[in-house]
Amino acid sequence: MTGNELRERFLKFFASKGHTIVHSSSLVPANDPTLLFTNAGMVQFKDVYLGLDRRPFTRATTAQKCVRAGGKHNDLDTVGRTARHHTFFEMLGNFSFGDYFKREAITYAWEFLTRVLELPPERLWVTVYQEDDEAYQLWQEIAGIPAERIVRMGEKDNFWAMGDTGPCGPCSEIIYDRGPEHACSSTPCALGACDCDRWLEIWNLVFMQYERDSNGNLSPLPRPSIDTGMGLERVASVLQGVDSNFDTDLIAPLIKAVEKITGRTYDPGEAGFPFRVIADHARSCTFLIADGILPGNEGRSYVLRRILRRAARFGKALGIDEPFLYRLVDTVVAIMGGAYPEVAEQQEHIARVIEQEEIRFHETLNDGLKVLNGILERARQEGREVVSGLEAFTLYDTYGFPLDLTEEIAGEGGFKVDRDGFEKAMAAQRERARAAREDVKAYDFALAFAGALEDISGTAFTGYDQLEDKGTVLALFQEGARVTSLEANATGYVVLDRTPCYPEGGGQVGDRGELKWSGGQARVEDTRRLPDGKIVHQINVTAGTLVVGQEVEIAVDRERRQATARNHTVTHLLHRALKNILGEHVNQAGSLVTPERLRFDFTHFAPLTGEELRAVEAEVNQKILANLPVTTLETSYQEAKAMGATALFGEKYGERVRVVKIDAYSMELCGGTHLGSTSEAGSFRLVSESGIGAGVRRVEAVTGAAALEMALQDRQELATIAGLLKVPPDQAIQRVRHLLEQNKENERELAQLRNELASYTIDKLLDRVQEVAGVPVLPARVQITDPEALREMAERLRSRLGSGVVILGSQHNGRVNFVAMVSKDLVQRGIHAGNLLREVARIASGGGGGRADMAQAGGKDPGKLDQALAYSLKVVAAQVR
């Protein structure tokens, strides 16, 4: 029987019993803030149970789409690890709203299972709430189930509640006995005594009698009612004779589709875990989007994003490095579209949303995953079992890597994440952002002057032609208020009618300088321009009192201005050189020009090679040595563009613009201050090159004396290196190359010796294999310090054993390294390398973990290495089944 046929038979059966077939409600619960998603069939009838709503029927039956991911009912982390758990599933149900109660519910369930589905009655067991004598008797009376197949259980298992509050009541679960061949090793393997795959819950009958309030108090519902839920996928697995829900016709086609995309064959064991996750998540993503949820950062949208990105990550584990999940939407629709037309109607939209989210996530994942793997490797080496909050926050803040994804990946490797530390780092960032906002507020305060200065004329800037001038104080400000004077030691702002001080703009920092007047003076700490063009000087009065109307002398800090102009002119040279070397696609994306150095951001698709960096540096220095004239002119914007001047993308320009021209080499629109000729820059040195965003690179550089100092430092370092190599400086490179070649040859010889030694060591180690519960186990201390070599040795030993468990330990620099390997057949017998090594490493004050077949760990106590290895035998004995 197919899954679709099962759904149809269920609905028709209950329709024949007077039930109204009600279509599935949305996965977004209507008017119910207590639930993230619809997670059971009764959700759409909650108000009916509470007596707040009435329907034109007292009996209903549904096939309800459900999601359990997030909130109290969250199966996300167990999906794919078991044969039964899903984020998305269908719940078949029959409901009574004050119509029938326990007797009829039990009668209908038994009839459907044994007569319609023809399940063998002797395979069916039931559980009842320990205090529900009525249900206990009814199962014997109606179904003839003997008392030994009716198990009383406690509130945890047999008292159902939808959430922390709301309708609830005792329940009775119908269990299908899959047979002793599926039994576990528990003694006894019995319903209620173990939770293995032999005992498959297929139907839960909830006898809705109470409502639980926020204080945990129970009160009778207005009308006792029935709510039942049967897992469609579970019953389909029984009817189709398969071991897992993932093997049913409801999900198996999705696994086949993943096989086709990956070119890999599905393994129903642990190796097939990624296939099962992807198949499940494709279903939940499709249905969530069909019900109007889009990926985002809050609430349901965040859960969808997490599910989608989790599937994408497992696709990467299968070797898929491009968006693929959207391609499974067609398969979901082919299976489910008949029963749920909403997914078929939105098929194209669903696929598009998934693809766009996959594209965004691949950008995040590729960078963040590399960093996280490095963090986990360091933690293993250090014997840590915890990823620090700062490490997790760096992943989140710098790489956009979600905390829950960090926790999930870390957990798979046997690590925990310090969530409290993460929250502290997040709080610290918020505080930094708040402080930054305070700084911005201070700047905005200066901008706010514009509204308070409407009564005064603008400021004339005279600094292109002179560094000293005289002006009149037009206005003074202190602590956000306009004042008439500033006394000695006061800090405030002054607006003059004219000034030679350049106001911050175009990436160039504002000038500093000095004000003098009769009987007083002040330091100019910064200069800024207001939106209306007026120029504000931030000053500190060092002597006397400055009053409105005072005549003052203004002098710019010459040395600082010259250094800034040097870096600004060279920024133009750099821009042109980058275009010449890399291509005309290069455009300025930002800059910072200070007296100390320059920073230039530009559009480019890849990091610069060493050759490109040398070419850029050489070209800029050539133009400096050429002593090219730097000239400026003011013209209209249109004429400047016609002349070929470079304008910054996104920058707003007025009708009149200033053009800075460096001979025939460079011509840009710019309001900054510049040199008279390029030779005044002295020299140019690149300091760094890096990426700051998608398609944006950043270089930092120095000029003049700073570039000379950098060259002198390089020369000194070369002399030091040459001294260590005992050769003249001009022979240092040749000597290093010779040493590198010699080192390669030594490494080749060492590798050969290691292989020979490893073969010898392996033969010796194999003599020390012990048998534990019929399992060959080799715990051994080895003299291997490199973790990669340790893994390789363990792999070779496992290969030679064929079937067995290898646990190797070594010590180096006061630390311990462990590696464990388990053959495939023993993984199936319950031995898990990650769990094994986690316990072993604790003996040596360490931790770690990993997969079932391979794991690594570290420790801090080398003195406990032998004890830890000996303990591994006990752990293996406890795991094997």
UniProtKB/Swiss-Prot annotation:
Presence of the UniProt keyword Cell inner membrane in the record: no
GO biological process terms on file: alanyl-tRNA aminoacylation
Gene Ontology CC annotation, any one: cytosol
Enzyme Commission number, as recorded: 6.1.1.7
Record note on domains: Consists of three domains; the N-terminal catalytic domain, the editing domain and the C-terminal C-Ala domain. The editing domain removes incorrectly charged amino acids, while the C-Ala domain, along with tRNA(Ala), serves as a bridge to cooperatively bring together the editing and aminoacylation centers thus stimulating deacylation of misacylated tRNAs.
PROSITE patterns: AA_TRNA_LIGASE_II_ALA
Enzyme class: ligase
InterPro entries listed in its UniProt record: aa-tRNA-synth_II/BPL/LPL (IPR045864), Ala-tRNA-lgiase_IIc (IPR002318), Ala-tRNA-ligase_IIc_anticod-bd (IPR018162), Ala-tRNA-synth_IIc_core (IPR018165), Ala-tRNA-synth_IIc_N (IPR018164), Ala-tRNA_ligase (IPR050058), Ala_tRNA_ligase_euk/bac (IPR023033), DHHA1_dom (IPR003156)
A GO molecular function held by the record: transferase activity
Keyword RNA-binding assigned: yes
Cofactor: Zn(2+)
Protein name as catalogued: Alanine--tRNA ligase
NCBIfam families documented for this protein: alaS
Protein's cellular compartments: Cytoplasm
Binding-site list for Zn(2+): 568, 572, 670, 674
General function of this protein: Catalyzes the attachment of alanine to tRNA(Ala) in a two-step reaction: alanine is first activated by ATP to form Ala-AMP and then transferred to the acceptor end of tRNA(Ala). Also edits incorrectly charged Ser-tRNA(Ala) and Gly-tRNA(Ala) via its editing domain.
Cofactor note as given: Binds 1 zinc ion per subunit.
Family, per entry: Belongs to the class-II aminoacyl-tRNA synthetase family.
TM ranges: none
Reactions catalysed, as given in the entry: tRNA(Ala) + L-alanine + ATP = L-alanyl-tRNA(Ala) + AMP + diphosphate
CDD domains, A to Z: AlaRS_core
Pfam families, A to Z: DHHA1, tRNA-synt_2c, tRNA_SAD
Keyword terms: Aminoacyl-tRNA synthetase, ATP-binding, Cytoplasm, Ligase, Metal-binding, Nucleotide-binding, Protein biosynthesis, RNA-binding, tRNA-binding, Zinc
Protein source organism: Moorella thermoacetica (strain ATCC 39073 / JCM 9320)
